[in-house]
Amino acid sequence: MNTLDFLDKKSLRDDIPEFRPGDTLNVNVKVIEGSKERVQVFKGVVIRRQGGGVRETFTVRKVSFGVGVERTFPVHSPTLASIEVLTRGDVRRAKLYYLRELRGKKAKIKEKR
């Protein structure tokens, strides 16, 4: 193991649940406004997960007031308060970019049994 891997291993979080593209998550993000800190919930479907180690990121997509919103989070970021897996999705792709073009019921992902 080289020096960078050793440094990366110290800053990895161990409280991250197992999740994959297609899963629906509640991502609790710490937001600092002035002197106050609060937790903001971002609920959506994971459309991709990429990278490894400290640089690993995932993108969550939701539709808010008819507008698609995507947000990319670093997995091991200290600004993430917690991640909750709500449902497991049954998909056959690693990157779900095709959901950007789908509307209504077609954009729904089957739940894994």
UniProtKB/Swiss-Prot annotation:
GO cellular component: cytosolic large ribosomal subunit
Origin: domain of life: Bacteria
PROSITE patterns recorded: RIBOSOMAL_L19 (PS01015)
UniProt keyword annotations, A-Z: Ribonucleoprotein, Ribosomal protein
Cysteines joined through disulfide linkages: none
Keyword NAD among record annotations: no
Protein name, as recorded: Large ribosomal subunit protein bL19
Protein species of origin: Rhodococcus erythropolis (strain PR4 / NBRC 100887)
